[in-house]
């Protein structure tokens, strides 16, 4: 068995995108096994993947260069990998990769395409074209290590019994979120004919979604009530998930559930559409010259009006569902 050590420590959605790549890699390379190193709370994302060992770490235990030397020593002693795949390409992971290279491991590192992404999101003279999907960038790391991998880009449903509509109205940044009033209006319409399950996390989100649950029939908030494993099971059973450009889109992709995705300041051209999801299920304002203004939606709107989100009509989302 050829043993590969791979790592990425954040963010949640980015780590979730790795899972289908690893599944297809292991299926196509039966003589390999993977040890995946990440934050402990991401473990359930990798549950049930054959020939994959998840190694959770608390990064506070491995601070600075000396801490990373300690982690390298531990991982090498526990697993003695022949190959090392850096799926993060940040300072911490770069140091780890150098330390493994000094131990004569064959290493490869993610190419994030930073220059192309800057060209896509800059204010003037944008180069607006589809960039390589992030999942293909992850796959390239394994190809650089000398393995073959052809991604299917297909959804694989985890549940045959599908019913209800999921809705995850929140995202990490304002530039990725429908105005909350529009989201509430959408739930009001959807719940007239469908069971609607609401997803979110954090106290503020839990409070908002609990209020909607109390006010509306056919609406259940699951925010703050489930473990990650339980949440994935629920999402797998949905007929469709409505999500912003957020981790929920990637969780649904992981369990083979169709996603109608809403895009504001960010753009799927940057390569972050959920694995196996269709561009036909994207809701966006297409002809805004200012869009995309950032890769992650974390920059304030320089126009000041968030037209990319405020101009979206809920009827456009409903059309995709019907």
What kind of region is each of these model predictions?
Residues 1-322:
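Catalytic machinery of carbohydrate-active enzymes
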